[in-house]
Amino acid sequence: MNDQSGTAQLRFLEETAIRLRQNGFTVEPIEDYHLPVCWEKGRLCRISGKGSVLYRQENVDSVRTQDALQSVIDTAKMTSEYMAILEYAPQLKATGLTGDYRILADFGDAVLAGHPTERGVQFVTWEWDFDRKGVHHGHYFQEDYDAAKRDFTVRSGLVQKDALFEPEQLAQIYHALSFVREQDESLSFGRDQELAELMEQVGGLLPTDALRQRDAPEQSSMTMK
């Protein structure tokens, strides 16, 4: 591992540790490019500097621990996404703007920026001035990366606002599909599979921890230790 790769992995793990603490997890000191994660006074898993989540089967033997593990996986995936972009993102230079803001996405009249702080990366969207030398009308999302991305797609014109579902709406759709699958005894096997696939697609659009009830996570998405 070269020094640049090692430094990037440490930054990812440090940022992930901040996010996990904000979500109620306990983390131990980083050791050998791995971040130990604890939940309810017990070791839950480890996150590698490359983003893999490693766990022991006996540590996730209940629905609650499986949900907690899925939350860690979602957090690691999200953090890995924006930290990889941030690593090579250009500085946002705008008249009157001070501080370390880096361009994560830039399209049309809108820009999405990340701002590294001691409390983790903070996210904001702006609209460019007509000459693209300044920005205005900032929407600040603190650590909510998913919300910042949704706002950017609308402000940039990539997606019309009416075409987007809010997380609460998606969660309601997910639970409605789950209710139909559980209660409708007349469902054919094929129709049930179609609804299961639709639930998976809807669940994939939801931000971390948006669902309070979910199926046990697929082990195929995790790395066994």
Regions found by a protein language model. Give the residues of each.
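Short Lys/Arg-enriched alpha/beta "domain-start" segment
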Residues: 1-27
